[in-house]
Each structure stands twice: as structure tokens, then as C-alpha cells.
């Protein structure tokens, strides 16, 4: 194992510049969030690669200190989809802690989970039950961190929620799981996520788990930068056809300084698309460090499909996959110490891209049971294979950045074991790097977040029934008040204890009309 830092003379490394801070989080009074150093088994899991780089001074993509996410903002806890949506879409910096699975929770019925077509009859008399999807327009200066459930040993799972980063800067997402499995779509439309908004089935976008882009106004002028996706898990499972779901982690347009590290991608078809077409190429676009990621059972392609951009691709493991990393139009990359096993076509640069390969002893690529190998390689198990031409380049990351930090370059033979141990969510205790204690819900802060969306997107927050929220306080509806005049309204705490009147926070309100019909809902009161 090499622990390496690349440095041009006259500059400090990103790791030396990184601030080491401390935090103190109280149950109801929050101090600004900060990040502490982080190791496990003696291994450093803090940020490195292009996301740690500040960028070039004088450009849109410059940020002092590199990617810091919500550092300096409040640490908050999201227990519901509405809270998650409000905090991540707010104009304020936040570190958002989640310790439970989250979906919209709004039931709907489809013909089949593998196809997901919404039925005309939503009574539940037929079809399979699933939940409506939704979209979160992630605003700048946000950190999202999952906490492992001690009973299940799993990190929080976000189901049918697409996280869109549209022309934004400074985002961190760590230790979370994502899936679109079973997301509903319209029978007559494309495969777009369908949400229930104000009682109306509404298409809200492609079924990407995470989509990074910069084409809100114009792809020629918009930009995004400084994004770190780390220790996350992405999957979808069986699908009716290869177009049922979209990407797990897609990236397009003019975005720079990204690191995707220690992630697990599995059970999917089209995994990662970086560049939506051959025209989606800009000077300096999509500078990505991609390391210690584990692709398992991707029965399709895009590990990733790269168009344009500069990618440092190292210490990644492919197992039981089909088409792998495909370097297309004007893509440039540096490949180090990756292990490819039982994969049809792990990497190719013969269709418009160019590749530099580290062939140092112990750090060259290893193939086992694969087909379509790069020229000059053979399988270590002797399996027969075809050969692909390599289009060469001499590019290395330090040609693009003034400084470049790479914590580790592990030997290729060690990569399968390392990725199986550390790649994915729930493998490393991450949240303690951001808070000393898990905070409590804060209704006042939730209300503030709803009322202060980022002006760049002006995205709305929706409640547990799909209705737009104007704030974190709500009252009993007019219908319920009318019913109360002839019957009664009862109030309960979340634990089921009956109370005489609503209290500050979340209450259960049960109304019974004159005909004996009962309606129960959660109500948030200031």
C-alpha cells in the first residue's frame, strides 16, 4: 500500500490545508457544524482526490478549502421525507443527520413492481403496492450523513427519491443507501418518477438515484463543482426492461472537482453516465476521482460510460458485470491498480477516449475470468479472451491540478478484499466526524428551512400526504373542525398517550364525525 500525496512546488497539499475542527451538539441548542479527522483500522477515510482541491483561483469553480459541504452550518436531524427535503433545499448551510429509512410513505398501486405502471384504479383492489416517488433539489453547502441502525446494522435507505444537484457547489453525501426499485411511472409517459403533489400524479424527473448536472439555464454557461459522494450504496434490482431505471450516479454538463469513493453499485443495468452525449464536452469539465468503488452484478453497462472529462480511476473492483468502463468521445483518464473479475468487457478506450495506465509492478490491472481485455493483458486464471486496442495518453492528475492528494494507492491484489470490507454504506462509522451526539428534531429550524428555500431553485417542500407545505405548523382542516362540532377531536402524543390539547411538536389528531367516520393524522404545532 502506498500513501501518496502529489505536490507541485510552492503549494501546500490539500490534506495539509484541511481544517481540523471540533464540535459540540446539544439536544435543543445547536452549534455550527465542523468536521473532525477520521480513521478506522488505522485507515484515513477523509476527503481526497479532486473534491479536496480548491480549484483554480479566479474561476467559478474555485472554493477555498475545497469541498466542505455544510460545515459551519447547524447540525440537524431529519426523521421524515419532508424534513429531509426542506433542509437539503434550504438556502442555509446544514449538516443533515439521518438514522432511519425514508420514503414519501404515500401508497400507490402499480401493475407490477418490475414495470411500475400506475393503475387507473388506486383503491388497492388490484395490483402491487409501492410508494410514490419525489425529488430533492439539493442546494449548495450541504452535508448528508447516514447513521447505522444498531439493530439492523444498515445505513438509512432512501427509496424512490432522486437527489438532483443542478448547478450547485459544495455538497457531501456519505453513508447512505439509494434505490429506485419499484418506483411508479405513468403508463402513457416515459419512465419518469411520479410523485403525488397536491393530489395530482406529477412526473418529477428521471429515475436517477443521484443526478449531478449544470443546465438549468444554459449548459454553455451554467456550472457546478465540489461534490463528494462517499461510502454509499446504490441498487435497483430486477427490471421489466433495461430502460426501467436510469443511472445510479449520473454526471453531466460543466461540473468540476468531484470525488466518488468507497461506494457499492450492484444489481442494476445502466450504472453511471458521465456526459449525456458527444456534445456534452467542455474545457476542464468533469474532473473526477473515482476510487475504492465496488461494482457487483451490473448486468448492463456504464461503469461508467465517460464522455469528455478527466478521470482518475484507481483501486476499483468489478465482479460479475457485463460492459464496464467505456471511454468515449474526448475522454481522458489515468488507470491504476484495479481488479476485474468475471466481467465481459471491463475497460476500453478504443471508441474516442484515451487512457494512461500505471504498469508499475504490483499496481497494474489484474484480470480474472474476463473477456475483451486491453491489449497486452491476460487473465490470471488462464481464461481465454479477446483483445481491445488501447488509445494512449500521458495524462496524470497533477497535470490538471496545482495540488492533488491521494491518501492510498493499494496494491491491485488487495483491492477485492478492501472493497468488500470498506465499500458501501454501514462499513465505517462516519457520523461522529460531524457531531458528538445525534441531535433531536427541531421544529423551529424545520419551519425556517421550509420558508427559506435556496433562491436558485425555489424548490417546494411536501408533507406526508403530498401537499405543499408553507411552514412546519399546520392546523386541523376545516372539514375536521366541522366534524368536531357534531362529534369530537382527540389528541395524542406520538407514543399514544392521550392529551387534552395539542402540544408543541408533533401530535396525533383523531377526528370522528357524526357518522362515526374516523380520520387520524400527524399535526405539527408551534
Question: For the regions a protein language model found, what residue spans apply to each?
Answer:
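Bacterial N-terminal signal peptides
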Residues: 18-31
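Sec/Tat signal peptide C-region and signal peptidase I cleavage site
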Residues: 31-37
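Acidic Gly/Asp/Thr-rich repetitive segments characteristic of extracellular carbohydrate-active
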Residues: 49-97, 492-499
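Extracellular beta-strand-rich solenoid/capping regions of secreted or surface-exposed proteins
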Residues: 85-92, 105-143, 154-174, 183-222
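Glycine-rich beta-solenoid repeat tracts in large extracellular/virion proteins
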Residues: 134-138, 157-167, 185-186, 208-222, ...
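Right-handed parallel beta-helix
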Residues: 140-146, 150, 169-182, 197-199, ...
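Extracellular beta-rich repeat passengers
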Residues: 305-307, 312-472
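C-terminal outer-membrane/trafficking sorting elements
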Residues: 473-526
Amino acid at each position: 500500500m502506498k500513501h501518496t500525496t502529489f505536490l507541485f512546488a510552492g503549494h501546500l497539499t490539500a490534506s495539509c490545508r484541511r481544517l481540523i475542527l471540533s464540535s459540540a451538539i446539544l439536544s435543543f441548542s445547536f452549534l455550527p457544524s465542523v468536521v473532525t479527522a477520521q480513521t478506522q483500522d488505522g485507515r484515513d477515510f477523509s476527503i481526497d482526490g479532486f473534491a479536496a482541491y480548491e480549484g483554480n483561483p479566479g474561476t467559478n469553480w474555485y472554493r477555498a478549502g475545497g469541498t466542505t459541504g455544510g460545515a459551519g452550518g447547524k447540525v440537524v436531524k431529519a426523521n421524515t421525507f419532508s424534513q429531509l427535503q426542506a433542509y437539503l433545499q434550504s438556502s442555509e448551510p446544514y449538516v443533515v443527520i439521518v438514522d432511519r429509512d425514508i420514503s414519501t410513505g404515500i401508497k400507490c398501486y402499480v401493475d407490477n413492481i418490475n414495470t411500475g405502471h400506475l393503475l387507473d384504479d388506486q383503491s388497492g383492489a388490484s395490483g402491487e403496492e409501492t410508494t410514490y416517488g419525489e425529488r430533492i433539489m439539493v442546494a449548495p453547502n450541504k452535508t448528508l450523513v447516514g447513521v447505522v441502525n444498531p439493530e439492523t446494522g444498515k445505513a438509512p435507505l432512501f427509496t424512490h427519491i432522486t437527489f438532483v444537484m443542478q448547478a450547485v457547489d459544495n455538497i457531501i453525501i456519505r453513508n447512505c443507501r439509494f434505490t429506485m426499485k419499484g418506483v411508479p411511472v405513468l403508463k402513457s409517459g416515459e419512465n419518469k418518477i411520479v410523485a403525488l403533489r397536491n393530489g395530482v400524479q406529477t412526473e418529477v424527473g428521471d429515475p436517477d438515484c443521484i443526478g449531478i448536472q449544470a443546465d438549468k439555464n444554459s449548459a454553455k454557461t451554467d456550472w457546478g463543482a465540489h461534490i463528494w459522494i462517499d461510502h454509499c450504496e446504490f441498487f435497483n434490482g430486477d427490471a421489466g426492461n433495461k430502460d426501467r431505471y436510469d443511472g445510479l450516479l449520473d454526471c453531466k454538463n460543466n461540473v468540476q472537482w468531484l470525488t466518488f469513493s468507497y461506494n457499492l453499485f450492484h444489481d442494476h443495468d445502466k450504472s453511471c453516465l458521465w456526459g449525456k452525449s458527444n456534445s456534452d464536452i467542455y474545457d476542464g469539465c468533469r474532473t473526477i476521482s473515482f476510487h475504492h468503488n465496488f461494482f457487483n452484478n451490473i448486468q448492463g453497462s456504464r461503469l461508467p460510460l465517460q464522455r469528455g472529462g478527466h478521470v482518475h480511476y484507481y483501486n476499483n473492483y468489478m465482479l460479475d458485470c457485463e460492459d464496464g468502463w467505456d471511454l468515449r468521445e474526448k475522454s481522458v483518464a489515468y488507470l491504476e491498480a484495479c481488479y476485474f473479475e468475471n466481467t465481459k468487457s471491463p475497460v476500453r478506450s478504443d471508441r474516442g477516449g484515451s487512457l494512461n495506465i500505471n504498469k508499475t509492478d504490483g499496481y497494474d490491472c489484474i484480470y480474472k475470468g474476463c473477456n475483451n481485455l486491453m491489449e497486452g493483458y491476460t487473465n490470471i486464471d488462464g481464461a481465454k479472451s479477446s483483445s481491445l486496442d488501447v488509445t494512449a495518453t500521458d495524462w496524470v492528475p497533477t497535470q490538471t491540478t496545482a495540488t492533488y492528494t491521494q491518501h492510498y494507492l493499494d496494491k491491485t491484489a488487495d483491492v477485492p478484499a478492501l472493497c468488500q470490507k470498506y465499500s458501501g454504506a454501514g462499513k465505517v462509522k462516519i457520523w461522529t466526524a460531524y457531531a458528538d451526539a445525534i441531535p433531536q428534531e427541531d421544529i423551529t429550524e424545520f419551519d425556517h428551512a421550509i420558508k427559506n428555500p435556496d433562491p436558485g431553485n425555489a424548490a417546494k417542500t411536501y408533507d406526508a400526504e403530498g401537499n405543499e407545505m408553507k411552514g412546519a405548523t399546520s392546523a386541523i382542516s376545516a372539514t375536521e373542525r366541522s366534524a368536531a362540532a357534531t362529534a369530537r377531536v382527540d389528541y395524542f402524543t406520538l407514543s399514544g398517550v392521550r392529551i387534552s390539547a395539542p402540544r408543541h411538536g408533533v401530535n396525533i389528531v383523531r377526528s370522528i364525525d357524526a357518522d362515526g367516520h374516523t380520520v387520524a393524522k400527524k399535526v405539527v404545532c408551534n
